[in-house]
Amino acid sequence: MRATPLRGPSNFAAPLHSEMAEASMPLTTLKAFMKMEAAGGIVLIAASAMALVLSNSPALTYYEALLETPVAIVVGPLSLHKPLLLWINDGLMAVFFLLVGLEIKREFLGGHLSDMRSALLPAMAAVGGMVVPALIYVGINWGQGPLLNGWAIPAATDIAFALGILALLGSRAPLALKVLLTAVAVIDDLGAIVIIALFYTAELSVASLVLAGAALAGLVALNLFGVRRLAPYAVLGLVLWVCVLKSGVHATLAGVAVALTIPYKPDTAGRSPLKELEHDLHKWVAFGVLPIFGFANAGVSFAGMTPASVLEPVTLGIALGLFIGKQIGVFGAAWLTVRFGLARMPEGVSWAQIYAMSLLCGIGFTMSLFIGSLAFENLPPDQAFDAPVRLGVLIGSVTSATIGYMILRFLPRRWSPKPRSSGS
């Protein structure tokens, strides 16, 4: 009778390696998904869709109770008490605006906005894309008193969503178009920051502003003295955020202020603190901050709504501002800028593609919802406009995204521009 040979280490290793490989497959798949350009937008859509489902189901009371859950941070005699929704809007969104500030600084110092002539086309397009939607909203809500506070809601662009749509299109969206959209959205974000600072600031606390100024001076000093470690910036940034929160100025602006003090220039090893922080924050914002914000703010209950609800001044002003205003403002300003010789068309981009891009700029979503949460926050409960704001943002953003995507997806190849000759 022949003895069965014992299994050596290599014999055991094969099935063990196979089991480990199978166990790691979900993690590998998750990592591959997170590397997709459109992944952040997909997660944001899923979180927002979940909010809509919960808001129109028996779970609505639990959803609302979750957002109203009181959360407190107490350090000695100092304490901050807020419902969970405000921690998300004031706290997590400060991290988002920190990332926005880093992107703005990088683009102006060493990116596509560092050259004045290159920056002029996206700058003019962004300004047009803010002014025209605001005018449409004001025109629809003229004479409506407090409703005019929402004029800036359709002026915003959600860069994460817009770039996510372009990423889904692959080669049908040329790199130059992505660069142009990014530049327009960055300048649009800068405009939104200015609008929040100037028009959506409550009564000011002088003492808190003085302390915030001292914290900001400390951050500037760190930069001037060449401090490149991020820990000191984080500590002073947290102090600045608390002071700004207590001052009456919206706390998210603290994130922008911190970003502008982070060193950009690389060291002898070629490492830039700003670029490293931007890289580290990107996934946290794309897969954490924005989906949580979308989940907390996109819930719209359709109970009691009728077709006439769409025609309410706030809803109609936002929806038309995003869908009609953005495409007129962005495309019109871009066309005039090129027509008068102030800037050149980007290499390899057609007017049809720029028109589609102007539609994608009408995806206001997270930024529009955020400004909407500020525009009417001081009104009494019986005059709340949360539902009309959310409905208008959803209608305008979804319509803009759908039509912009369809144009780029089915644009005939013959409409694509021919490469410029070297002599032109």
Residue ranges of predicted features:
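Functional cores that coordinate and move charged inorganic groups
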Residues: 166-263
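Entry/N-cap segments of selected transmembrane alpha helices
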Residues: 107-135, 205-214, 302-328, 351-355, ...
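Predominantly late transmembrane helices and immediately cytosolic-facing juxtamembrane segments
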Residues: 15-32, 36, 53-56, 69, ...
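Transmembrane alpha-helices that form the ion-translocation and gating core
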Residues: 124-163, 319-376, 395, 399-409
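Hydrophobic core segments of alpha-helical transmembrane domains in multi-pass membrane transport
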Residues: 43-56, 96-102, 132-137, 215-221, ...
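Structural signature of hydrophobic alpha-helical transmembrane segments
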Residues: 86-97, 145-160, 201-214, 250-257, ...
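Hydrophobic transmembrane alpha-helices of secondary-active transporters
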Residues: 77, 81-110, 260-262, 285-305, ...
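Transmembrane alpha-helix boundary signature
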Residues: 54-66, 79-85, 99-115, 131-152
